[in-house]
């Protein structure tokens, strides 16, 4: 029992800074929306449309680079720290190549925006302008993620948290300058949010690099000599590990976007209630998602040390802590769902629907916690392909079709509206949790030599 308590302390020491960093990141998006809304409703809508395109694109790159964390954690655990700097350099090359692709996609996203039915031309122009300003921050964001993954792979999560809050504090005044045109800058409205956020990502990256250069604990890593050129073999391995994670993230984001589109014809009340419940459940998701990142580090580190039993302990501890957290957040959601809904809107119909949907959200929080932590465990084992297959099957083969049938057809019951989609979420997330656990058990029952050989690739 003592080993689980000790492991839980180590996990939480890693997870809490990651949680706070994620809160800072979320707060930046909130600040952009509020400050753009203070300028005009059109600018706020433009930022919302632009963000809905930016997120899937940048999260794809983010997911690709998540491969670095278990690689660095295992090298650190095995005492092969001299190889870490080379992996990080290749991570920067990969981030640079992916940034170019993302920037090209975002530059041409105007075709998607203007294709939207009945969109106001002025709104479309502002959304395109916002994206074309924001896209210059894509390299800064992804370079920051490489540096952050280096620190977190070495079990140092606090730098990412500090840089997140630095970014938030810088974002507010820079937003103000570019939205309203102060200190000789042009008045750009919502487009100014894109300029500010792009600049902030570069500030965060440069601040993180400055920290890494000065950190005594990483002196041996930054002094490591080696080629700075792209090395196809290393980059290929990072892509093989990271691409399934990137695709899984992309599938998850697009799933919720598709459901939002399917709900939109049902009316204002249904759309508002769905959005409130989704926004709140996304906030709750920060907890297990951050814990999953910590579990990846701990499992990878233990495998690097050559201890499959300690890796199992880290995995089981992460699951136990995650289930405890999810139980508490579910109780909180059920107990205060109406009061939470009232914070968003005071329309009685909207509040009633949102409260009902949050009840369904509480049901799946434990499954959601298990599946996302399970994904983190599999990343630690470098078993990332299974994450993609499980995500695709659970969300797109089971969850979305069942939600569609329940929400919009009478094949099983009378059309349930948004609640049908949320039952689909429950089906999808529960299926994902079961499959993640089965895959984890399959891996852990392999002979230790095979587990370590797979993990060291």
From Swiss-Prot:
Annotated GO MF terms: antiporter activity; xenobiotic transmembrane transporter activity
Any one Gene Ontology BP term: sodium ion transport
Membrane topology: Multi-pass membrane protein
One of the Pfam families matching this protein, by short name: MatE
Chief place where the protein resides: membrane
Protein origin, superkingdom: Bacteria
Subcellular location, record wording: Cell inner membrane
InterPro entries with a match to the protein in the record: MATE_fam, MATE_MdtK, MdtK-like, Multidrug-R_MdtK
GO terms for cellular component: plasma membrane
Keywords assigned by UniProt, alphabetized: Antiport, Cell inner membrane, Cell membrane, Ion transport, Membrane, Sodium, Sodium transport, Transmembrane, Transmembrane helix, Transport
Sequence ranges on the Cytoplasmic membrane side: 1-10, 74-92, 148-159, 210-242, 297-313, 371-386, 439-457
HAMAP family: MdtK
PANTHER family found in the cross-reference section: FMN_FAD EXPORTER YEEO-RELATED, MULTIDRUG RESISTANCE PROTEIN NORM-RELATED
Purpose: Multidrug efflux pump that functions probably as a Na(+)/drug antiporter.
Family note: Belongs to the multi antimicrobial extrusion (MATE) (TC 2.A.66.1) family. MdtK subfamily.
NCBIfam families in alphabetical order: matE
Protein name: Multidrug resistance protein MdtK
Source species taxonomy: Bacteria, Pseudomonadati, Pseudomonadota, Gammaproteobacteria, Enterobacterales
Gene: mdtK
């Amino acid at each position: 029992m003592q080993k689980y308590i000790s492991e839980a302390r180590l996990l939480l020491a890693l997870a809490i800074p990651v949680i706070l960093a994620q809160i800072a990141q979320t707060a930046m998006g909130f600040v952009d929306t509020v400050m753009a809304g203070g300028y005009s409703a059109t600018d706020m809508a433009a930022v919302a449309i632009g963000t809905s395109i930016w997120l899937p694109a940048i999260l794809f790159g983010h997911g690709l680079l998540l491969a670095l964390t278990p690689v660095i954690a295992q090298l650190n655990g095995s005492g092969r720290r001299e190889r870490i700097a080379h992996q990080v350099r290749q991570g920067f090359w990969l981030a640079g190549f992916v940034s170019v692709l993302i920037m090209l996609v975002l530059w041409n996203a105007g075709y998607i925006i203007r294709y939207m039915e009945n969109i106001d031309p002025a709104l479309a122009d502002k959304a395109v302008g916002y994206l074309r300003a924001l896209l210059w921050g894509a390299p800064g964001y992804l370079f920051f993620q490489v540096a952050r993954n280096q620190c977190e792979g070495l079990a140092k999560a606090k730098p990412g948290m500090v840089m997140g809050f630095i970014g938030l504090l810088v974002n507010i005044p820079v937003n103000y300058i570019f939205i309203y045109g102060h200190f000789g800058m042009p008045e750009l409205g919502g487009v100014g949010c894109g300029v500010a956020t792009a600049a902030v990502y570069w500030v965060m990256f440069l601040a993180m690099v400055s920290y890494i250069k000065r950190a005594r604990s990483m002196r041996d890593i930054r002094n490591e000599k080696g080629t700075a050129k792209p090395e196809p073999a290393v980059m290929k391995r990072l892509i093989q590990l990271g691409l399934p994670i990137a695709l899984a993230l992309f599938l998850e984001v697009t799933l919720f976007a598709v459901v939002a589109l399917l709900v939109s014809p049902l009316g204002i009340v249904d759309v508002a209630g769905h959005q409130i419940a989704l926004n709140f459940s996304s906030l709750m998701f920060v907890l297990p998602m951050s814990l999953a990142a910590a579990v990846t580090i701990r499992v990878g580190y233990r495998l690097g040390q050559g201890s499959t039993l300690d890796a199992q302990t880290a995995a089981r501890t992460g699951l136990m802590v995650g289930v405890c957290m999810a139980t508490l957040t579910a109780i909180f959601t059920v107990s205060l769902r109406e009061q939470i809904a009232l914070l968003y809107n005071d329309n009685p119909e909207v509040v009633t629907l949102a409260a009902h949907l949050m009840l369904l959200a509480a049901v799946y929080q434990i499954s959601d916690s298990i599946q996302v932590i399970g994904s983190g465990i599999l990343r630690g084992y470098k078993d990332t392909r299974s994450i993609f297959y499980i995500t695709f099957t659970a969300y797109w083969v089971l969850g979305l079709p069942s939600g569609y049938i329940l929400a919009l057809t009478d094949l099983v019951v009378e059309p349930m509206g948004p609640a049908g989609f949320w039952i689909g979420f429950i089906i999808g997330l529960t299926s994902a949790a079961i499959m993640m656990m089965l895959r984890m058990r399959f891996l852990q029952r392999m002979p230790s030599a095979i587990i370590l050989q797979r993990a060291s690739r």
